[in-house]
């Protein structure tokens, strides 16, 4: 037991925390998971992207970052390695070169990225997060129920992280999933629709 391991923290605050999300609802989705879902969906970055139950807007914001080549660490104030002065002097000039190279790759496409949120307060939080992420001109947030969502013409991808667990009482879950399935069939023809859920019983009601 005479062996010790010494490690240096190169990241600082956890890397999944992008730095843009100030306002959250209950049980918000992890930013890295949200980005992974967008990539897994095969979205082409040009067609419509919709989250009609957007909560605090994380999935929509990550879609906007991916579509416009905005680096995931763009909003972080610093990383742990920037304070390694005694062990390994921080090379600010090299860092600025790397940072500027990433920034120069940012594009400004006109995607249609839209979210819907039933709660006025949560919809407001989503809009505030979009401003913090500087994508408020790309992402549009509507205060509406999913079944009343006005779907833009064309095709695209829908990703939903529906309420679950502490965000919803159990008796309403089956009804919610049935509503999602009905809305997909009635309004989202031509869209690839994804639902993030571990509730296999509830999935039976999607149809």
Regions found by a protein language model. Give the residues of each.
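Conserved S-adenosyl-L-methionine
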Residues: 29-150, 166, 174
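Beta-sheet entry/capping signal
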Residues: 3-5, 46-49, 112, 157, ...
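A short, flexible beta-alpha/helix-coil linker loop
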Residues: 13-14, 163-167
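Class I SAM-dependent methyltransferase Rossmann-like catalytic core
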Residues: 19-29
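Conserved Class I SAM-dependent methyltransferase catalytic core
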Residues: 110-112, 116-125, 166-207
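A short acidic, Gly/Pro-enriched loop at the edge of an enzyme's catalytic core
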Residues: 147-159
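Non-catalytic substrate-recognition/targeting regions of SAM-dependent transferases
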Residues: 1-21
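Short, internal active-site loops enriched in acidic
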Residues: 2, 147, 199-202
């Amino acid at each position: 037991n005479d062996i010790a391991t010494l490690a240096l923290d190169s990241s600082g605050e956890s890397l999944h925390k992008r730095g843009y999300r100030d306002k959250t609802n209950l049980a918000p989705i992890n930013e890295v998971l949200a980005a992974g879902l967008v990539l897994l969906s095969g979205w082409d970055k040009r067609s419509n992207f919709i989250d009609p139950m957007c909560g605090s807007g994380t999935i929509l914001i990550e879609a906007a970052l991916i579509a416009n080549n905005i680096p995931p660490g763009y909003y972080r104030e610093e990383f742990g390695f920037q304070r390694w002065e005694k062990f390994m002097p921080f090379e600010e000039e090299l860092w600025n070169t790397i940072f500027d190279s990433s920034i120069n790759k940012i594009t400004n496409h006109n995607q249609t990225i839209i979210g819907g949120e039933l709660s006025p307060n949560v919809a407001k939080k989503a809009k505030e997060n979009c401003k913090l992420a500087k994508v408020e001109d790309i992402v549009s947030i509507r205060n509406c129920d999913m079944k009343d969502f006005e779907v833009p013409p064309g095709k695209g991808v829908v990703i939903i992280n529906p309420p679950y667990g502490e965000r919803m009482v159990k008796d309403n879950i089956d009804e919610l999933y049935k509503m999602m399935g009905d809305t997909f069939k009635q309004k989202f023809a031509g869209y690839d629709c994804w639902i993030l859920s571990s509730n296999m019983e509830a999935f039976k009601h999607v149809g």
